[in-house]
Amino acid sequence: MNCTVGNNIYHTYINYFVNNIYNSLSRNINSKINKYYNYYKKSKIFKNIKFYFNLLTFESNYCCDSGQNKYLYDGYNSYYFINIPLQIKFNNLKSRFINYNIINIPKINQSGDIILNGYLRLPILYLQLATNNISYIFNEKITRTYFIKIKNNIYLYIYLYDDFITVYINSYKIKNDLFSMYNNVSFKNKYINFSKIDNVIYVMNLKNNNIKYHIFDKTININNFVNNTMFMDILSIVNKFLNLNLKKKFIQSSNNLINKSTNSVLKTIFRQFTKSVTIFDIEKYCDKLLYKKKIFRSFNIVLFKEHLLVNPVIHYTDQLNVLSYLTNKFKINIFGYSNSSNDKFKVSTNLRKIQSDYIGFINIVNTPDGDTCGLISKLANNTILDKFKLKLINCNNEYFENFTKIDITSKNLYNMTSNNFINIKKNSTFKVKQIEVFKNNEFKLINFDKNKTNKNLNVFNTLSITELIIPFLFNNDPCRGLMGSKMHTQALPLIYNEHPYVMTKYNHMNGLLFNKCITSLCEGIIVSVNNYKIIVMDDKNRYLHYYLYPFNVLDYNSFVSYKPIVWVGEKINIGKILALPSDLKHSEFTLGVNNLLNYSFYNGYEHEDAIVINKNLIIEDILTSISFDVYEEYLSINKLDYVELTLRHLLEYNRYNRYLINEVGVSSNQDYMLFGDILSTKIRYELSLSKNKKFFKVFKLIFKENKKLIVYTKPLTIKRGGEGRLIKYEILGYSKFRQLDAMYPEINVSYLTLRFFIFKIDRINIGDKLCGRHGNKGVVSKIVDNIDLPYTFRGLCPYSITSPIGALARINLGQFLEGSCGYFGLNFNCRIKAPINLYNYHLYSNMYLKNIFNSLNVYNNSYINFSIEKYLRDFKTGYQLKNFNLMLMPYFLKLMHTSKSKFQYRTVGKYSSLTQQPVKGKRVNGSQKFGEMEVWALESHGSAYTIRELGYIKTNVKYFKKFEHKGYKGSETFKVLTLELKNVLININRVDNYSYFNQKIKYNY
């Protein structure tokens, strides 16, 4: 591996802007200046403007946070100022040189992420139509203009006017002969591009025949058109229109990938350049220079925030684990770029559907829920981005020796095999005669012997990495497979993770994760290795220190800890991996543990996918994770009004608030911090009261002496559910004050930042959510001692117990196959590489399991001893259990939805005075709304008093929102209870007597 992968990303990023700035300055900007030359004469300001591109400079903004600290404050934006010298010749003055700020670009790290407002953001790819047309009337004739994107900022313009066609590339007209460069070309290279050769030969035939075709609703001579072009890419684009109208070779839908091109956020950032580098902005800038006005970089800063901070194609980087980080790199926006701030935009259903040409390039399974369903997906693992085109890698051609590359256009021209498999039945191998192929945008069954296809579509070409690591994926419902792939990205890294007994061939580390590892920058020998530092001595006897930083707190308070994989005395080369993240073990994805699971029943606690776990999981710290809470406090200063200071002694003493303040004024207690404990307290020292004149008069009447006003602010305390240990606090001072107000940057600033790190150990608890790799998830309902669990005749107790009904009801059979193979691996101390699709290798699953068993050299009676149908005994009586029992060994993960962060309790009270509803929010110790499922949960736990409180009218939100009441009809909870009683043939009605003479009014629920 090469250690300069991160540097290559950085160089490509900088070179993109440098090249595009040069092209724009040499073509577009100069043409704009010449176009507005008459305007300069009228204004009598400019005479000439000259750009010095060779003196282009990059100026970095001030980094007010530590470069080694991974946790940044919420206002941190790191970017470059790109400046270019301008020589401006005025009419009445001498020439002057100015350093003009043309664009601001964000900084990127070695992983390709940018930092915006203190969080790492990930720019994703998005699709856009490569061809757009505009029609207008000029001199009573219709003129059509077609804009076709070729490369980054290079566009092809085709103008159709009065049976004439004119082709431009940006602003240059094409008039050269096209086929002069192809007369003596012999196509002997076996790595050729199918689409280009097909286009050249096809248009050559058109030239020889000298036929007129009806293109763009106009009759154009092909011979004349060919003589006026010179680029093969242009010829391919024109041939695409010919095929659409004549051959019907491609799909005419605009949603097809043929008509789209992939774009990145670089194009969005470069839009600032076209808006900022205009002659009017330069004139305003020079006007401020002439009249000595104060110049701010506010315009480019506003453009920077407008294009990046609220950009829909820049997402937050999810770094909860390695898989979540990796899947974000494959994101793609199929809908395209939109400036709309409304999330509930309306998109046609045809765009949300899976297109036929997505197969092999875009993952057809993975998509988010909600409004963006079908609009945001992930690229398949084989898809690469080559010159802003999606190309396929893994395609085998029978005429070539090696694998070749084909693009989207060639894919639609040839047949493609979708499931080329071999079945094994009765120990005999035979080939399938009929096979399903993808031809002419349809799936057809053809004879395999007559129609030989030369391209195979593998599973690797259609799924992403989170689906490929799931064994027996195709033995499940597709919805459960999608749920399992998403839950891999929500799994918490554990302290003690394990290798799965059942794995796939895609479970190894991907090449994209190379930037997440700590690599060597030189050749040398390892001198020292420990948990926080690796020392390497190079060939010149220099010592290089690589710090591992055991706990790097990242976005969303997640962290990454590194573990060294080298030893003392080992010789290393450049690019050698020295340390891996904690969720990678031996270069494999290890996010969970092997769970000895018993599919059985346990006094009803396993109902509705609930899980009963063994208490030994807590004692041995299995399924234990670590999390951080970071609290920040800013001390600001206003030169005219106030200054904020820390307070050493508290103004009010509260015996419930434990505190120990040091000489700095912050908490120095290293003990366990509870809810409500004070971390720091600050006061606002008012310097002047001249703004509020009325308050100033009252203050002078009360205090006749010259006294200053001190305002006591709310202290920084531990939030509910954030109990932990204070392991570190930072005091960050800035040599340059951090700006708080954009209008007055020199007055209102922050001069100090206090940051507290609370360390939490999250052990498994009741209410935590566990899941398997097949979408089977459940909540921990009870923690049982080891002596209260059933056991085998060898004294083995399961780690957890769950119900087998949910798996069969959801057609989730892959977990049984995985658990059976994992149980064999536990007993025989081996690991099994399982296929994703069982039917690719064997016809029956039972035969596959028997083949695994027969491959192990054991006695015949071992099958009975190690059978998955264990004979469990009751822990009370010791007799054999008669109900259904099944012992499996699946791989389980711990999800991020922990009970400590979700549970919220309160006493009766704290109702709103207006609506008489419970207050909302954790800060005010509020509660949540109760729905129908919550009422069912209270009924199952026998919470009669809580249900009685919910049955009152004050719990009905809709009743209090409507002020026109037409009689009391009861709360919604009371209606749910009466409907459930009707299911058991108990009818409850309420009768109201308004008067002796009136009839009775009956309310039926």
UniProtKB/Swiss-Prot annotation:
EC numbers on record: 2.7.7.6
Gene that specifies this protein: rpoB
Identification of the protein by name: DNA-directed RNA polymerase subunit beta
GO terms (BP aspect): DNA-templated transcription
Organism phylogeny: Eukaryota, Sar, Alveolata, Apicomplexa, Aconoidasida
Oligomer status and interactors: In plastids the minimal PEP RNA polymerase catalytic core is composed of four subunits: alpha, beta, beta', and beta''. When a (nuclear-encoded) sigma factor is associated with the core the holoenzyme is formed, which can initiate transcription (Potential).
S-S bonds: none
Entry's Gene Ontology cellular component terms: apicoplast; DNA-directed RNA polymerase complex; mitochondrion
InterPro entries per the UniProt record, alphabetical: DNA-dir_RNA_pol_su2 (IPR015712), DNA-dir_RNAP_su2_dom (IPR007120), DNA-dir_RNAP_su2_hyb_sf (IPR037033), RNA_pol_bsu_CS (IPR007121), RNA_pol_Rpb2_3 (IPR007645)
Catalytic activity: RNA(n) + a ribonucleoside 5'-triphosphate = RNA(n+1) + diphosphate
SUPFAM superfamilies reported for this sequence: beta and beta-prime subunits of DNA dependent RNA-polymerase
Keyword Nucleotidyltransferase in annotation: yes
Function of the molecule: DNA-dependent RNA polymerase catalyzes the transcription of DNA into RNA using the four ribonucleoside triphosphates as substrates.
Main location class: plastid
Alphabetized UniProt keyword annotations: Apicoplast, DNA-directed RNA polymerase, Nucleotidyltransferase, Plastid, Transcription, Transferase
An example Gene Ontology molecular-function term: DNA binding
Region forming the signal peptide: none
Annotated family: Belongs to the RNA polymerase beta chain family.
One Pfam family here: RNA_pol_Rpb2_3
Matches recorded under Gene3D superfamilies: 2.40.50.100, 3.90.1100.10, DNA-directed RNA polymerase, subunit 2, domain 6, RNA polymerase alpha subunit dimerisation domain
Compartments where found: Plastid, Apicoplast
